[in-house]
């Protein structure tokens, strides 16, 4: 039935409506005090509505409505359906995943404490949800350290083991499973766990202190010592708590911040006048929505499902669904303070919300930058186990099989780090064998870093194909360093090979990751060929000088040290060469003549040119 035909038959009752597109996908879930009036308003006020609403109405092809007893029921159902369908036009909690809870099975004779992501109506106590999983883990660690809660899954008292487990031996449990701890004593301890998770640390400390004194009076000094240690740990935890002086003690304080389509709602949980925790939610699809609608949607979708709510909820401003939400919160009163200590708390919560929203925007900006960062792209495209923040690239260079050398250039965060460049002469064998050369160089490079206890690079890049890659892999395996990432880059097709993968990877020509690899490969080639040319030049100079009679290795080194090259020697004067130890004027003249330099004969007479006649 077309939507227009459904409108006249809608009831003027509280309920929830679902707009759907041509494929039956839910576009939007809304609630209404009077369904017919609310749904009709989408067409009656279409020209006055926001661009977002007009875009949704153009896609609407069907309507589903659900009648409920009251506005409070409508609010609850709306939040449930939004979480189920994730409609694209609703204000939604960003990353609305199932956050974990701490579950205490108080419905069992011997309750357990565990983590769960499912909130069930099973009689257990749930604490959370925890957006900060680290905070939840810290709370659980305190519970395990102070309270001897059983960790087994036996359905006590009916199902039980024959003997206590290891937890009993290390005093983490008192073995109620085999009757070493009574049900009454265990339940008293669970009450303290619940108080602790509920933020009533002072009550827990008072109870532990009473039990410690009672144990001392009964001369049970071992038990008294255990309780004393637990009390000391609780006091240490309690000392840094922030005290917020407001009468009444327990309340949740809401802060709100908005930046365009993004919004943040922060809740400070205050118990016994002390700030126990801070939680928050980020919202998306908030464009074209009033702040009141955004705040109400967040509290309905998130805060309403929280287990450990306070009796008072302070919000920064009023919103349309406040009364309906309050009715659904079962004993929590919503207040909008205008001045005084309560308003100061709300202002503090607002400040927290602004800070969290700024952090989120910065994190999003960094994520966008990482998307084009060659280091992150390389890890993503190649599936590398470690982010290649540091990489070393190897290249082999030779001149027609002679003067074989190698280079290792180092890149950090995509940029060359020249202080870490290294060059090598191939020593193990003579001749031209790229595979053996690569094996030798990789072995020498990583062995030296291991010996010097220098950090190893995250990735090694080989200039070459599968053969060079295999040689490098063998070298790393022999050194016991298989955890280092290893790839090779073939020049012709710019194919990237990975050991163990039969097919190469080809990145787009404009890929920042490929350009970074090309830069490293080209830099390694430049560094290697420069060293190879220097080595060849030195060999040429050596052979040329050693052919001259009277010039041995010592004189050759002295000449090269002084003049740098054969050409430098040719351009020197007899006096300059004669000044070098081991040379005299005669040997200097013979050296220059041997190098083909015409040296004037100092013993021949000189002919003076006639002088000009005097001026008359």
From Swiss-Prot:
UniProt subunit comment: Interacts with UvrB in an incision complex.
Function per UniProt: The UvrABC repair system catalyzes the recognition and processing of DNA lesions. UvrC both incises the 5' and 3' sides of the lesion. The N-terminal half is responsible for the 3' incision and the C-terminal half is responsible for the 5' incision.
Main localisation: cytoplasm
Alphabetical keyword list: Cytoplasm, DNA damage, DNA excision, DNA repair, Excision nuclease, SOS response
Top-level taxon: Bacteria
A GO cellular-component term linked to this record: excinuclease repair complex
Pfam families: GIY-YIG (PF01541), HHH_5 (PF14520), UVR (PF02151), UvrC_RNaseH (PF22920), UvrC_RNaseH_dom (PF08459)
The keyword Methyltransferase is annotated on this UniProt entry: no
Presence of the UniProt keyword Transferase in the record: no
InterPro entries given in the database record: GIY-YIG_endonuc, GIY-YIG_endonuc_sf, GIY-YIG_UvrC_Cho, Hlx-hairpin-Hlx_DNA-bd_motif, RuvA_2-like, UVR_dom, UVR_dom_sf, UvrABC_protein_C
UVR domain boundaries: 202-237
Compartment list: Cytoplasm
Protein name: UvrABC system protein C
GO molecular function annotation: DNA binding; excinuclease ABC activity
GO terms classed as biological process: nucleotide-excision repair; SOS response
Occurrences of domain GIY-YIG (ranges): 12-91
Family affiliation: Belongs to the UvrC family.
